[in-house]
Every structure is written in C-alpha cells, then in structure tokens.
Amino acid sequence: MLDKLWDDIVAGPQPERGLEKLRKLTTTLKDDGASNQLMRSTSIPTTPTTPVTPTTPSSARKVDNVWRSVFNPGSNSATKSIGAHVFDKPLPNTPTVYDWMYSGDTRSKHR
C-alpha cells in the first residue's frame, strides 16, 4: 500500500526496502538455560530538542524603550553624542536638496 501512496515529487525517492529503512524494530529471545529473557533492540530516530538561548535576568539588564529611540533619535544613548556633530552640520559648500532640485541639469523639461 505504501508503494501506491508514495509520491516522488513530494516525498522524494522511495526507500530501498520498504518500511525497514524508515523504522527498525528487532526482537530477539535469548535462552540462558533455566530462564528466558527478552532482549529488544529499537532504533527509532529521536526528535531533536529546541536549543535554549541563555538569558540575563531582567533585573540585571537595562530595558531600552525602542519607540523612544525611533521617534526621538537624540535620546539613544549610543548615538547621542555623534548626532549633533555629524548629522546636523553639513560640510561647507555642500549642495542642499534645493540646489539639486532646481539646478539646470536636474530640472524638469516638461512645462
């Protein structure tokens, strides 16, 4: 029945010999004379566990307010000191957006 349901496109190539390749379950009886013991060998793949990421206790780390840093860029402690020095002061003789928009090369020819 498995041969009829197997789909090469979805499931890939068929195993070499039926379900024995997918699940191996062997049971052997060992005779020690007076007592009979049942020996069982099972090889079924186990499900891997999800790895756990180590975390710092919440009391030990500083919680940053993401929205405050997005809407108030100067409040970000990592970039607070460079904001005014780098982003707010352009270099001398740097063209502005208006210079670029209204120059002869980039001005729209459609009138």
From Swiss-Prot:
Q: Which cysteines are joined by disulfide bonds?
A: none
Write out the tissue specificity statement of the associated record: Expressed in axilary buds and in non-growing stems and roots. Detected in sepals, stamens and carpels, but barely detected in petals or leaflets.
Please give the residue ranges the record annotates as the region Disordered: 30-60
Q: Cite the entry's keywords alphabetically.
A: Developmental protein
Q: Where is the composition biased (Low complexity)?
A: 41-59
List the InterPro entries hit by this protein, alphabetically. DRM/ARP
Expression induction or repression = Strongly down-regulated in axillary buds within 6 hours after decapitation and then up-regulated.
Q: Does the keyword Plastid apply?
A: no
Its family remark reads: Belongs to the DRM1/ARP family.
Enumerate the PANTHER family for this protein. DORMANCY-ASSOCIATED PROTEIN 1
The protein's name in its UniProt record:
Dormancy-associated protein 1
Q: What is the lineage of its organism?
A: Eukaryota, Viridiplantae, Streptophyta, Embryophyta, Tracheophyta
Gene name tied to this protein = DRM1
